[in-house]
Every structure is written in C-alpha cells, then in structure tokens.
Amino acid sequence: VLDRIVGYKLSPFLWKNIRGGSSLSAGRVQSVAVSLIVDREREIQSFVPEEYWSIDAKLCEKGETSAFAAKLQTKNDEKFDIHNEEEANAVLAELKSVPFTVSGVKKSIRKKQPAPPFITSTLQQEASIKLGFQSRRTMRIAQELYEGVDVPGMGAVGLITYMRTDSLRISAEARAAAAEYIEQVYGKEYLPSSAKVYKSKGNVQDAHEAIRPTMPGLAPARLKDCLSSDQYKLYKLVWDRFIASQMAPALYDTVSIDIAAGAYGFKASGFTVQFDGFTVLYPYGDEEKSSIPKHAAEGDVLKVRELKPNQHFTAPPSRFTEASLIKALEENGIGRPSTYSPIITTIISHNYVEREGKALKPTSLGMVI
C-alpha cells in the first residue's frame, strides 16, 4: 500500500516537472533503491583520497629457510599511522638496528559454521557473485526449476522449493534426507552433533520453506544431462548450499604471534585446517593459509629477510552491484523477496540507473529526480 501511495503522489510530480516525465514513475522501494545508488555516487564523487603507508616484514626462525609475513601494528603499544614516504623511511631506519623477538604466542581452535539455506535475497546475491547472473535471470531459471524439468525415468520433476520466500524454515523430512545423504557420501563425522535449525529474521512471511532441493538425495551430477547449463549451475548452487547448511562446522588451528622490534610491534597470524567440515562441499570466505611456524615460542629471536614499505591511498566506496543493492534493501527492511528483481529491472528500464560492468550507476536523470 505504501508503494502505491508514494507512487500516486510522486509520479504526477515527475510527469509535470521533468522533460519526458510521462514515462517516469516512483514507488517506495523503487525510490529508495534509486536514492541508495545516487547517494553512493555522490559519496564517490566527493571522495578525496588520503595517502598512508604500511610496513611488512618477512621473518624466519633461526635455522629455518621458509619465511612468514608480519605486519607493523603498533608503536609504544599503541596503534599509529604512517602518513608519507618520509615517515616510512624513518621507521625503517629504526627497525634496521633492533632485534625482532617473539613477545607472545596465542593458539586457539576456531569453529566456522555453514551459511543457512537460501532465501530469495541471498540466492540472488550469491548467484550474482558466484555465477554472474542478474537477479532477473536468477529468478527466471529458479522458476523453471520449481515448475519442473523432465528427468529420465521420473517425468516432470520440480527440483527446488518455491523461490520467493524470506523464511529459513526447513521441513523435518528434508533435514533427515540431507543427513542421510551426508552420512552416506561423506561419513558420520560430517554430521553436526545436533540437527541444524536456522532462525528467520522478524516480520517474516513463513508461508514457504527456505529455497532447497525438493529431493536432497538427487545430486547435481545426476541431472547434468537433462538440465540446461544455466539450470544446472543454479540447481548446483541451491543444492550445495542446502546440503552444506546441514553439515558439521569446519575447525581451524589458529596461531597469532606478537613480535617486538624496539618500540615497534608486529603481528603475524595464520591457520591450518583441522577438519574441513561443510567446506568440503561449499567453501566460502577469502581467508589465506599462512606458513606461521608451529613451534614459535616467546623469546625466540627471528631473522629479518625483508622489510618492505608499501604506499596506499584510501579508496572511495564501491558502486552498488545487484548483489550489494539487494543486501542493502533487505538489511533496511525495504521491499519483499518478490520485489527485488522487478525493482532493479524497473529503475534500469526507466533510465534512472544503468549498468557499468556489474556496477549500478545512476544516470543524469537518476541524479536529479
């Protein structure tokens, strides 16, 4: 109703006051989407980059040949900034005359939980990021998978549940089928200690389950010959995410080393995989493993292989992509699962916004309405 009220009030104003305005329209979600994109563009246009420097070290323990990376963090136990090359060179001069000593070692086990199954917004976001699909394309393919695909020996089969939903609810039958598949294919150790139940956010219309395969035991590889390329990619994305959501967490052995170098403090950190858990099927994140020495101890004197100053400039915020715009709308409680894709299509078709690669950029018209 709010969308209609806003549209009725604003659209006549646009028609009267902007050339060519008879083709213009406004609605609550549409207006917010354009406003977010325009505000971001203004931030980018007004952004003034600032110079700063960092110093990286490559260190190794005595008798070791492999080096590990550490970053300068503190001076006199406080965070500090290096603003220019002159300051960076002054710090380097001090560092070259002092020993590098391990001042602290922290070890821990970190647990990483799988992401929940998809809802409409997260499916659109992930398909954009991982598959390069625009939201309209994602929803069209999801509709095809939902309505049914001819599978040899089975006839027309709906392969995924309804794709317009904001609920994370999963039926007990689907959860049990996923657990059975996981145990058969990966082993009992890949099952969590208790069944995974995900809570939906408030104000959710719980008429439909989360987006999941209708038959969790029907792995994507079995369907590759009867699906189009796009259908296969999206089904695999939905299937992988759902099965992974019902798997055990990944476990990492983490190490953090503090290094004293005169008045300066460096830090090095890294991890090794203790148990891959759900990531055997659905890896995500951009963490990098590190060659941190496993047996480093407080008091160890380290050999300096390299000290490297690096110049940086602060960067403006990135333009919205479809994925990040949908996420922003969802986080601000704007719109419903069924509206995200049509809204993006509308603001582009009305020439308020245009695509520049994956980015969404306001047009000159979008900047003034």
Q: Which functions belong to the PLM regions below?
A:
Residues 264-293:
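Polybasic, glycine- and aromatic-enriched phosphate-binding surface used to engage nucleic acids
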Residues 1-107, 143, 210-267, 272:
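Phosphate-backbone binding and catalysis cores of DNA-processing enzymes
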Residues 84-236, 242, 246, 250-254, ...:
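Structured DNA-binding interfaces in DNA transaction proteins
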Residues 77-79, 170, 275-278:
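A short local loop/turn or secondary-structure capping micro-motif enriched for an aromatic residue
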Residues 7, 27, 270-280, 335, ...:
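Glycine-centered small-residue hotspots that permit tight backbone geometry or close packing
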Residues 60-62, 151-152, 273, 352:
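Short polar/acidic secondary-structure junctions
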Residues 12, 32, 275, 338-340, ...:
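Basic, gly/Ser/Thr/Pro-rich low-complexity segments located predominantly at protein N termini
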